[in-house]
Amino acid sequence: MNRNSLLWLGAATLLATTGYAAAQTGAAAIGVTASVIKDVRLSNARSPKARPVVLRQRIALADLIQTGQGSQLQVLLLDRSSFSIGANATLRIDRFVYDPARGRNSGASVTRGAFRFMSGQANRANNTAISSPVATIGIRGTVLEGAVGEGAAKIAQGEVREVRQANADKRTATLVVLRGPGQRTEAGTDVGAASVTSGGVTVELTEPMMAAFVPREGAAPIGPFRISAAGLVLLEDQIFPVRVSGGGLLGGLLKALPAVLPGFGGSGNGKPQVFVPPVPVGRPSGAPGQF
């Protein structure tokens, strides 16, 4: 058994254990925290007071996760997909239905902050919907990044002229970027696709690095447009505000070739710890910026 298989076996065992504990309280575990850095808190209907999140803590449906200043989180879900969120972000998994033989159907809400979603298996049978305050984002077997709020507006304003004339709402504006897998990804993975719907209009993103921006509630998406290298770096900095000292994976790889991110993090006190799930898509062999 190779290292990746052992890592996933460990994650599955952890989820099975926490799933049993969750079942005792009526909450089914759908994932586990793979990275926790600095101030990350969780609340739900059973425990409305937000409490600190720790590494390898189970996540259940409807758990509301919030990050503080300079903080970040990665959640590994049962189907090997993952969510990463940056500082001052809010995430909730609203729906999760997974059958290994038929694929996944899941839904989540991001009401502020920057995020990355990575499909565990890069094929279009795995459908995910992410809701922001102004848009619905459909994801079909791929890797997607985005931001909600002032950070999204700042990035988009530097990308296309239409955004500067759109009177963006700095609380709810939403930027979405399709990241991959790219056409040159090995292992026969699907390129995947994403859609952004708002104001009765849907924009399709079918190529890596294509983006769309929704400036405010009721407005049609602006795009698709190709995000610049500078804009992509700004988005990456919002998703991953913390860099491991000495460079390494987070210091250089994120800006040069943002591939599927192994888990990293700490116990909530800022001290890095490591929990490394395997890369769920093929090794990139194309140009930087594609998976």
Positions of the model-derived regions?
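Generic short beta-strand segments
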Residues: I37-V40, G70-L73, T142-L144
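N-terminal post-signal-peptidase region of extra-cytosolic proteins
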Residues: A45-A62, Q66-Q72, L78
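His/acidic/aromatic-lined binding-pocket segments of jelly-roll/cupin-type domains
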Residues: G31-T33, I65-Q66, F83, G107-A108, ...
